Amino acid sequence: MRKALAAAALLLLSLSLQAGNLAFSSMIGDNMVLQQNTKVRIWGTASPRASVTVNASWSKKPPVTAKADAEGHWEVMLETYGASFTPQTVVASSGGEKVTASNVLIGEVWLCSGQSNMEMTLGGGMGTPVEGSLDEIALSAQYKGVRHVTIKKARATEPQYDAEGEWQVCNPATSPRFSAVGYFFATRLSKALDVPVGIINASWGGSVIEAWMGEELLKDCPDVDLANASSKEVNDMYKPMIMYNAMFRPASKYAVAGILWFQGESNISISNEVYAERLTAMAAEWRRDIGRGDIPFLIVELQPYDYYDGQYGLQDEHGPLVREQQFIASKSIPNAGLVGTNDLAYEHERTQIHASQKRQIGERLCYQALSLAYGYPNLPAFNPCFKSAKLEDGKVIVSFDNARSGFMGLSEEIRGFEIAGGGGHFQPAHAEVRMSFMGTTVVLSTPAVPEPVEVRYCFKDFEVGNLKGANGLPIIPFRAKVAEAEEESN
């Protein structure tokens, strides 16, 4: 009798261990948004070598079947149709097991990544509020189609199969934990397109760009020690490749329409001179992993901030160096955009790296997404940026791209422009907007510099200019040599 009971107990234990093996990836579940009009990956785990069948409620085709590998990993590709606010389900079954993802919407999905200014939630933090967040949070339930998932912070020295995260609907209880930039982008895009929008937020405050790059890219960087990835002596924020492996690689399996990137503060003193090269390489790597070489890649310019205030022990002009590198990268990366933020810092935020104006960033990202990804190329979504500079009767004539309709009128002196002579000593310049049939230019002069050879605009850690394009967007800060600028632009 005892032997029979023991055998029965062992059998029950064996069955219990085998039960419950079927599961979706953490990123696949209730409330998710799937990218419309494409094939999306659904993946998870099951018993090794088990057959898994996946059925989507919107599909008119037969269920899709896959076989788990030796580790129990499985994945299938499902075809999605046009966007809809009608809730759907995805069901996976294997043997007697079944798992269901409910309240699934089909629409547009974007990946947000970077460091703390992307991670910063709509609810804000201690001493770091988000301007206008109370109204947004209180009224957030109106955005029925907006969903958000935060990828849990994790570190790994090898690419991971899965990452932790749970999709959330948008309401006053959940929206305070959404990425603020991601929230404003998603809600505006959802209204503009009248489709559901999902945001995948994979961010880590303080992280350097090297943490988001793979070993394949970093092994050729002489200043990067890959051994630091597993070192206990190095802060996680500065460890190479660990976030790429643990957070991005799993997220890259999820079909998305584009990428939003807000990072660079931590590279102010680390590899700032090669930041454009690394960002360009990273964008190509991410696109390769996602499986779309032309996916829109939108970069947020660093907001004005006094990096030299003693907190970092740096000299002035480290901030503008990275901004310049961001601009270079935006021109090197195909189908990319740079959202200018020079006007989005108040004077009292001079030493606050988490500036409060996040709504405008999300909205400007939305405008560029509409232009690059959704068939509205004539939308004036891009910031005026430097094109050329020439010398004319002792004055510097500066031309701009993305300023076809000129600049907004001002009742005050234009500020932010400086010119320098051969000695390299910059002086504030008087600026006048000149309009002609050839286009709109800015004419710069000062008696202090009779023979200017260099020009710059807001090329400091914290300097907020006041000249904006007719579209209301600020000029991208720049520096250039007057004699060579026109040749370089050709």
Over which residues does each language-model region extend?
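Primarily membrane-embedded glycan-assembly and transfer machineries that use lipid-linked glycans
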Residues: A6-A9, I259
